[in-house]
Amino acid sequence: VLSTGSGNVRSAVRALERVGAQVTLTHDPGRVAEADGLVVPGVGAFGAVMDQLRAVDAPRLIEQRLAGGRPVLGICVGMQVMFDRSEEHGTAEEGLGQWPGTVRRLQADIVPHMGWSQVRPPRDSVLFDGVAEERFYFVHSYAATEDPAELLGPGPTRLPRATWATHGQDFIAAVENGALC
């Protein structure tokens, strides 16, 4: 688990340990590079999480892992920063650019979205294997709402596959894209 000072790091560590994972909390470049998988947690404002990631050279470390086909999982804002940018709090903030798209405020009667929502994963989802069409708990005010595969269009690259949920509008709950989820 990437250590950045983010508020939900301990929750991510405990959840992974509960399902039997051997977890190391680190931002050491060697350990990040050698890990079987890397979890990028994040809670709070998009810009603050990007600042935390830059402070530990995480953009470069994540890029190196992905270039080598090594798994990376973003959770919460850790997933949102994988998109091109955010318009959180009316300020344009650059993300890591792994997926095209912009994270924007949800268009719903009640924001933040705090509650259970059913997810709709793509067919043959690896990430949601065995839990397709289940309900998951969300706490967020911002989300990407444009399918990254549609923004990319046809080409030689493997297209990202979005899992969707709804709160006032459809939003991306997760993305599977080879080694990046």
Residue spans for each PLM region:
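Structural motif
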Residues: 39-41
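Pocket-forming structural segment of enzyme catalytic cores
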Residues: 84-166
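A glycine-centered loop/beta-turn motif at secondary-structure junctions
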Residues: 157-158, 166-181
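Cysteine-nucleophile active-site neighborhood
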Residues: 44-116
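Structural alpha-helical scaffold elements that stabilize or flank donor/cofactor-binding regions
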Residues: 31-32, 65
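N-terminal beta1-alpha1 ligand-phosphate binding loop
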Residues: 1-21
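An anion/phosphate-binding loop that grips the pyrophosphate of nucleotide cofactors and donors
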Residues: 35
